[in-house]
Amino acid sequence: MLVFDIETDGLLEDLTKIHCMCIKDTSTDTMYRYTPENIEDGIKKLMVAGETICGHNVIAFDLPAIKKLYPWFTVCKDKVIDTLVYARLVFSEVNYIDNKLTRIGVLPKRLYGSHSLKAYGYRLGVLKGTYCETEDAWAIFTPEMLDYNEQDVVVTEALYKKCSKKTTTEQALSLEHKAQWLMVRMENNGFTFDKEKAIELMSTLQNKQIEVLNQLAHMVPRIPDKVFIPKRDNKSKGYKAGIPIQRYKEFNPNSRQQVLWIMKDYYKYPFSNPDMHTEDGKIQLNEETFKLIVKDTEAPEEVRKLAELFQENFLLTKRLGQLIDGKNGWLKLVSEDGKIHGHVNPNGAITGRATHRKPNIAQVPHVGTEYGKECRELFTVPEGWYQVGIDACGLELRCLSHYMYPFDNGEYANECVNGDIHTKNQIAAGLPERNMAKTFIYGFLYGAGDAKIGQIVGGTAEHGAELRKKFLKETPAIKKLQSYVKNLLSEYDVGL
């Protein structure tokens, strides 16, 4: 196997040269070092027929970088091992590992949870070096850069060996690599974005928010600030020495503290609905809470109107945040090619699901929500192309049924694929509505406590405990799976 790493003068979209390259042939334990004068020799070495090549983040960076500057370069994807992909697969619980490592000083806190090569260097005790921290480190080639490059290969090989000791399957590793290749291709292709229509939507949302804020400004009471006691008279300001003056805060519609004071302290709204609270009992001010207040027939008309305006302002703020105001606003991320090149990590969550950033395309509002259709239609295709949408069905429950198979001979799996699993869960939990069953099962699977589960039926933590007990009684395979996992984990220490 050939373990390699390159150093360039910039990121993928900007780089103009590869300064150096190091390749470790693990079969002979030989390190090859390539400088600007013989870089092509190193690139040709990677193309040796039948040789497996290995590197960290090479699918997303190193290999595309080489291809960009040397178009004749080609590699067999099935012969590529990316230790970033490998590590994400076998060390998905890296945050739990890092709790201890940061506490004892092995890993710097800034690298907590990171899958970077630098972070793994600390975890494995094979440090990368600090050359990259020097000023203009990548402007020109230096011997120190080559040494740093070689150390990256050393860390990569150590990480590969560590990953190889973890239990996984060739099928899983192959699947994750295929997903990474596909996501990189998708990111490079980008999503065609209708910028003109986005600007129109921005204007519509901003004008609507101005209208909402004007209504709020005329309705909200003045919010008390600190009491000011002047030490001397001030005729122009009307101050009298020693006479207290009540000052007031400027109204900030996005301040949850101010909104809570208006609703709870000034209007005495009780927030008695359990769905208005977090699991630890705190009032949560969000769109859902305000929608519940609007529907509360016992609330005064003025309170319901305020709740409606607050809810709409929160919604508009959220939509404008996604569109333009936020750090990753869509309009800020449109490239010169008219596309948004969002990043997808196909194994970013501890559950094995994908994560998205710059921007989070998965959070584009769906058509059933306010302004959802207008947001969705911004993401389009080049002229002459057709856009097709697909969705996966019941992923979590299908995965769950796989692990339940030894305990129920595939009964749950059969219901997932051929029946209506949410209706089955509804009956098992004794819930009146199918949608309640969907909310319940996902909350249950992701660790919701009794209080949270109780909220599903508008009850207490005691109701939640009873609901959980009934569901486990009617679905014994899940209870057996829980016991199996607990017993299995008790035999191991979590860590690298």
Residue ranges and their predicted role:
Residues 377-381, 387-390, 398-399, 406:
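C-terminal RecA-like lobe
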Residues 17-20, 396-429:
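Metal-dependent catalytic core segments for phosphate chemistry
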Residues 436-446:
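Short, amphipathic alpha-helical "recognition" segments used to contact nucleic acids or chromatin
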Residues 73-77, 95-97, 210, 268-276, ...:
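Cytochrome P450 catalytic domain signature, combining two hallmark sequence patches
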Residues 1-7, 15, 29, 104-112, ...:
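Conserved "right-hand" nucleotidyltransferase catalytic core of DNA-directed polymerases
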Residues 12, 16-19, 23-36, 51-164, ...:
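Active-site-proximal helix-loop-helix substrate-binding element of RNase H-like nuclease domains
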Residues 1-3, 52-53, 78, 387:
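Hydrophobic "anchor" residues on beta-strands that sit immediately upstream
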